[in-house]
């Protein structure tokens, strides 16, 4: 038994490291795709798109503004103790971009995740008048992917319902709606 466990662990590590390398290679190949017609056109690569500005229906204070949603840090946006009620987040981009998907991240830190309100049902609209997506988010602190597949210069996210914060180790839940990050992926 003392010999079998290390062998299994070593084999698992070797297998996982090889699979990860293959996935990275496949992603690199996909990012380099070209479309051939009567002329050859190189497709622009899918990449993160960063807003030039944002607006929130409310902020807890300037330290919890909507700019925190795209700063690639653990800082969060929080509403002004409204429990996600009537929450609207609007993002403006410098140009019209074809957005394939967005990734929403609730608070990664367990205590913040548990004690804060989190968006549950959301509606996403854009400056394209007929575009709308509704999605129920999971009540977890993993990244959640939402397909968009639309051109837009502005994206608006409305919170329609929320998961309430919970008590943790005798500490009362917070009344603020919180979100850590929103990443936008598209082609310009």
Residue ranges of model-derived segments:
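Disordered, acidic Ser/Thr/Pro-rich linker "stalks" and the adjacent N-terminal cap
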Residues: 1, 24-92
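Short proline/glycine- and polar residue-rich coil/turn motifs
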Residues: 135-140
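Small/flexible residues
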Residues: 20, 34, 122-125
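Hydrophobic single-pass membrane-insertion segments
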Residues: 7-25
């Amino acid at each position: 038994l003392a010999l079998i466990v290390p062998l299994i662990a070593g084999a698992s590590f070797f297998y996982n490291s090889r699979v990860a390398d293959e996935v990275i290679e496949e992603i690199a190949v996909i990012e380099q795709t070209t479309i051939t017609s009567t002329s050859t056109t190189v497709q622009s690569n899918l990449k993160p798109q960063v807003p030039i500005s944002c607006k929130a229906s409310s902020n807890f204070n300037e330290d919890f503004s909507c700019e925190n949603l795209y700063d690639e840090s653990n800082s969060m946006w929080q509403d002004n103790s409204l429990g996600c009620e009537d929450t609207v987040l609007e993002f403006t981009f410098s140009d019209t971009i074809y957005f394939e998907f967005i990734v929403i991240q609730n608070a990664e830190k367990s205590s913040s995740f548990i004690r804060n309100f989190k968006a549950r049902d959301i509606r996403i609209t854009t400056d394209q008048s007929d575009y709308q997506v509704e999605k129920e988010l999971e009540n977890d602190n993993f990244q959640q992917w939402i397909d968009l597949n639309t051109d837009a210069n502005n994206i608006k996210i409305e919170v329609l319902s929320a998961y309430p914060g919970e008590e943790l180790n005798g500490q009362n839940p917070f009344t603020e709606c919180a979100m850590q990050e929103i990443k936008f992926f598209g082609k310009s």
